[in-house]
Curated annotation (Swiss-Prot):
GO CC, alphabetical: cytosol
Principal location: cytoplasm
Primary role: Could be a nuclease involved in processing of the 5'-end of pre-16S rRNA.
Protein name (Swiss-Prot/TrEMBL): Putative pre-16S rRNA nuclease
Keywords, comma-separated and alphabetical: Cytoplasm, Hydrolase, Nuclease, Ribosome biogenesis
CDD domains associated with the record: YqgF (cd16964)
Pfam families: RuvX
Listed GO MF terms: nuclease activity
KW Disulfide bond (keyword) present: no
Domain of life: Bacteria
EC number: 3.1.-.-
Keyword hit for Secreted: no
């Protein structure tokens, strides 16, 4: 049983999946969202859930530094509510403060070009969101 991690943005969705034991997160893809057909986003995620036998989906919840939820966080919560109609999984919202910034710093320190960073940053953020969740589950 695997866990899927999502970094939901307005233009793309970074997607990561756990190994079967739930120890490590691997980047799966960066999905380009369709402006005209939001349903395609949910159907694509539903197909990944089936393909990878996912039981839990972790969605990054952008919070302000004071812990409050702003417009981006509200969009993520709305996305999660809609996704529940497409998948039979547990959906968990996970604090993602600074994950995109941390992912970008990691890629810069690895000397990844700006063009390549742009194509993988959301996937890396999804990996960081999912790995944070998996690490916390191991402590329980």
């Amino acid at each position: 049983m695997r866990t899927l991690g999502l970094d939901v943005g307005t233009k793309t969705i970074g997607i990561a999946v756990s190994d079967a034991l739930g120890w490590t997160a691997q980047g799966l893809e960066t999905w380009r969202r369709s402006d005209a057909n939001e349903q395609a986003d949910f159907e694509h995620i539903a197909s990944l859930v089936k393909e990878h036998e996912v039981t839990t989906i972790v969605i990054g919840l952008p919070k302000n530094m004071d812990g409050s939820i702003g417009p981006s966080g509200e969009r993520s919560e709305t996305f999660a509510a809609e996704l529940r109609r497409y998948v039979p999984c547990e959906i968990v919202m996970w604090d993602e403060r600074l994950t995109t910034t941390a992912a970008e710093r990691m890629l810069i320190s690895a000397d990844v070009s700006r063009k390549k960073r742009k194509s993988v940053i959301d996937k890396m953020a999804a990996v960081m969101i999912l790995q944070g969740y998996l690490d916390r589950q191991q402590l329980k």
